[in-house]
Structure formats: C-alpha cells, structure tokens
Amino acid sequence: MSQDAAIAEQTPVEHLSAVDSASHSVLSTPSNKAERDEIKAYGEGEEHEPVVEIPKRPASAYVTVSIMCIMIAFGGFVFGWDTGTISGFINQTDFIRRFGMKHKDGTNYLSKVRTGLIVSIFNIGCAIGGIILSKLGDMYGRKVGLIVVVVIYIIGIIIQIASINKWYQYFIGRIISGLGVGGIAVLSPMLISEVSPKHLRGTLVSCYQLMITAGIFLGYCTNFGTKNYSNSVQWRVPLGLCFAWALFMIGGMTFVPESPRYLAEVGKIEEAKRSIAVSNKVAVDDPSVLAEVEAVLAGVEAEKLAGNASWGELFSSKTKVLQRLIMGAMIQSLQQLTGDNYFFYYGTTIFKAVGLSDSFETSIVLGIVNFASTFVGIYVVERYGRRTCLLWGAASMTACMVVYASVGVTRLWPNGQDQPSSKGAGNCMIVFACFYIFCFATTWAPIPYVVVSETFPLRVKSKAMSIATAANWLWGFLIGFFTPFITGAINFYYGYVFMGCLVFMFFYVLLVVPETKGLTLEEVNTMWEEGVLPWKSASWVPPSRRGANYDAEEMAHDDKPLYKRMFSTK
C-alpha cells in the first residue's frame, strides 16, 4: 500500500466529526497533520522560491473536464426548458380551456392574475429551494445534493402532467418543480466553479447559462411543434420530455468529480488531490496539485478554527461577507431587471401585439439568437473579464431598449391601438429585440452566475449563494406576475422602466463589482479581505506573486474624484 493510500485510510469522516465537535481543526489530527506536512513540503522551500502553480496545457487536454462541467451545467437546461415552454403554454388552446375561465360568450381565457401566478410562482419555488435545498451540498456533497434536487424537480413535473382541469394542481406542481430548480441553480454553478481550472472557470461556469439558452430555444421549438394539436399533447409532451432531461443529468453526475473543496472540508484529502488532478489533467503527485491542495486546506483550516458558519455571519462586515452578499444579491437582481424575462416569458404574447401572424415562429428566432450569442459570452468572459463585459453589456442593452420602447410607443400604432399595427415598426422592434438578446446573452446572462460562484468564502458559500440567487428568483416572480398588468396599463412604455434599470446597472458595476478574471477562489477571497477598490481590481496582484515594490495599501485607497476616474486616459 502506498503512503498516500495509507494516509487516506487514516482520515475517516467519523473522526473528522469528533474533531469538529471539540472545536479543533480538521487538520489538527495526527493523520491529517501528516498529510498536511507532506503537502507543505512541496510548497515550502527557500524564502524566495516561486509558488508552484498548475501549468496551462493545450486546449485538447481540457476536453474531459469541459464535458464533465457541461454535464453539471445541464441543470441550466432544465430551467431554460421551463422558461421556453411556459411562454407557449399560456397561449395554447387546450391549456387555456383546462386551466382558464370562460367569458359570457363561452370563449375561454386566462385572466391576468391567473396567468401571472402560473408563470411566476415557479420563481417563488426556486427562491425557497435555493435557500433550503442548497444546504444539501454542504451536508452530503455537491453531487449528491444535485441528484436529490433533480428528483424533487421530477415530482413537481409529475404533478403538473397529472393535472386535468384544476389550475391550482398545476400551480402546486410548478412550486414543487421550482424547489428543485432553485437547488440546481445554486449547486450547479457552485460545483463547476470548484472543479474547473482557474483559467477556464469563467468559461465553464458560463456553460450553465449556455444550457439555459439551449433549454429556452428547444422549449420554443417544442411548443411550435405541438401547437397544432387540439388536445393535451400541446403541453403534456413538452412536460413529459422533462423526465429525459432529469435522467440525463442524474446519469451525468456519476462521471463528474466531487468538489475538492468539499472533500478537503470533510477530511478526504486523497480524494481532493485526485479531483484536482483529474480536472487539471496532471498526475496526482504533481507538485502543483499538492500546492493547490495546500492552499485549499489552509482556507478550510482557518474556517474550521472559526467554528460553524451561521446565517447571522452573512451580515457581518468583518471579512467583507456582508459587502459580498449585497453585491451578489444586487448582481442577480439586476440580471432580472435587464428585462430579459419580459421577452422570454411573454415573447409569444409580445409578438402578437406587433401584428405577427405566427408569434411562435418569432419566439424561435429569439431563442436562436439567445443560444448562439451565449457562445460569444463564453469566450468574452475570460478574454475581457467580468467587469468590462458587464459594463459594455449594460451600455449596449440601454441603447437597444431605448429604440425598442420608442418605436413601440410612437410608431407601432400610427392610427391608434384599435387599428392595424405598422409592419415596418413591428419589424424594427423585432430586430432590436434580437440585438438586445445578443447583448444580454453575451454579458449579463452568464456573468452574474460566474461572479456569484467565485465571490464567497467556502464556509458561507452555499448560504450566501442561495440568498443571492433567491434575489434573482424574487425579481423573476415580480416581473413574471406584474408584467401582464403593467403592459396592459402602459404597454411599450414598460421598456423605459428597464432602460432606467440598465443605466443604474452601469454605474453600480463601475463602482462596486471587482474584476476576478484569472484568480483562484482563495485569491478572490484575499482580494475582498484586503478591501481592494473595484476600479483598481484588474491591477491587483495576489500575495504569492507580488514583488518587493508592490503597494497593497494603494489598491484600497483612491483620492481621485469619480469624474476623473471615469474619463481618465491613464
């Protein structure tokens, strides 16, 4: 038996629990101390010896880890599928007949209240599931946690399919499936961020958003394929396909590595080393792997010594956790306030308003643009950084929304809303809606998930991510529920509301959101603790790579006025 194997056998989880209960570090046990000493031997040497980092390899070397992360990211497809299909369901005749009401003349319709509830209650389930079920990732591991929440999602789908003519049964099913998707939305980006190589982390976490867009697009296509049926095939077939997506994800979990940070936290040091080695395509005993494990263990040990994390700790400013939580919740909230779900939830309804004969087809066009554009987003997030992309995204979406709303308000109905709409104005609105979707899909669609997944320290990560993601779901509910009422009252003036939010987003990112491109999760944590100013964060250097003349204090202070910061050429 090798020395590594012998050490691994001496670190049982039961012993870890006993140590934790006595308020000692997981690394203070003799066996784990030996493991730690072995690892530190590779990271320590002469005082000026550079830190050993995992080397970058050719792109072909990362095919395996990329495929594994795509399997994890498939949870986003589940969410996207719901978004794409529900927008069509509320316009399908059989769905309206079963779950709607009747006018005095006998025609069926869905009231604005019922439409808003059916569409948006899913988000409330997601918010609750994200907060409650994300804890499974800390208790049983990210992989097991994902499998459990997918099973909960399936239960909700079964209830929806079994609904015959009671809208509240379908309503309850959407809440339960939302619980599962809420857990997925926290655990999927979390696991991807923890297993992916640092120089690919932004790209691979963005795959979660890519899967969302794929789900939306294929959901639109499925609605288009079933719209000509006159029975429940219209909506039950798209729901039935959810079983295939769920089973694919559960099967994929058997092939992906567990989070090395979770494994280190529960004392499985050897497995943590293997996870890092697999993800980075290097040997388990490579010095760079041992150095990486050492960095993870140092963070875990510090968190263990501090005791169990409580919900109250999220509101402490001691280690900048509160500031990070506010930033994460704001970024996720602002993603919804871009107005994306105004198009995705009600796209079919919107394009009916601009006079299209088949609004289902136009929804497919939006879905194609959304899906294809996300590939660009996967590239730019690592090429240009999180902060730069968010700034450009907010500016470009503002321009698109101004044109879209202005044409809708001033040109769509030249002779009044009771008269036919202008075809030219309608086409212009569709074009700028596509431009808007392109700008959103390349920036604000994937990057909030990236930023939130790499912002929080391990000890509060699941709690903080669940709160931040819950903010996204809450705003999704509000937009989904109130949009029918708002558009009924002010129509395309609604676009100006989103335009105002987009302007605010630009300045919020400029002043609050730091750049984290190319940093390990531990380095991101250090940057926050040092209080680095967001507009200086792109120039920040981790302690392990600093020269003798580096001034860390200067990164946390700036006497230059705001207007000079914004327009300075230096």
Swiss-Prot record:
Residue numbers on the Cytoplasmic membrane side: 1-60, 138-143, 196-201, 258-340, 382-388, 453-469, 513-570
The species this protein was found in: Saccharomyces cerevisiae (strain ATCC 204508 / S288c)
Name of the protein: High-affinity hexose transporter HXT6
Extracellular side: 82-116, 165-174, 223-236, 358-363, 410-431, 491
Glycosylation sites: N91, N228
Record keyword Amino-acid biosynthesis present: no
Recorded GO MF terms: carbohydrate:proton symporter activity; D-glucose transmembrane transporter activity; fructose transmembrane transporter activity; mannose transmembrane transporter activity
Matching CDD domains: MFS_HXT (cd17356)
Keywords: Glycoprotein, Isopeptide bond, Membrane, Repeat, Sugar transport, Transmembrane, Transmembrane helix, Transport, Ubl conjugation
InterPro entries: MFS_dom (IPR020846), MFS_sugar_transport-like (IPR005828), MFS_Sugar_Transporters (IPR050360), MFS_trans_sf (IPR036259), Sugar/inositol_transpt (IPR003663), Sugar_transporter_CS (IPR005829)
One GO cellular component, as annotated: mitochondrial membrane
Subcellular location(s) of the protein: Membrane
UniProt gene name: HXT6
Membrane topology: Multi-pass membrane protein
NCBIfam families to which the protein is assigned, alphabetical: SP (TIGR00879)
GO BP field: carbohydrate transport; hexose transmembrane transport; transmembrane transport
The family this protein is said to belong to: Belongs to the major facilitator superfamily. Sugar transporter (TC 2.A.1.1) family.
Transmembrane segments: 61-81, 117-137, 144-164, 175-195, 202-222, 237-257, 341-357, 364-381, 389-409, 432-452, 470-490, 492-512
Purpose of the protein: High-affinity glucose transporter.
Crosslink position(s): Glycyl lysine isopeptide (Lys-Gly) (interchain with G-Cter in ubiquitin): K560
A Pfam family per the record: Sugar_tr
UniProt keyword annotation of Repeat present: yes
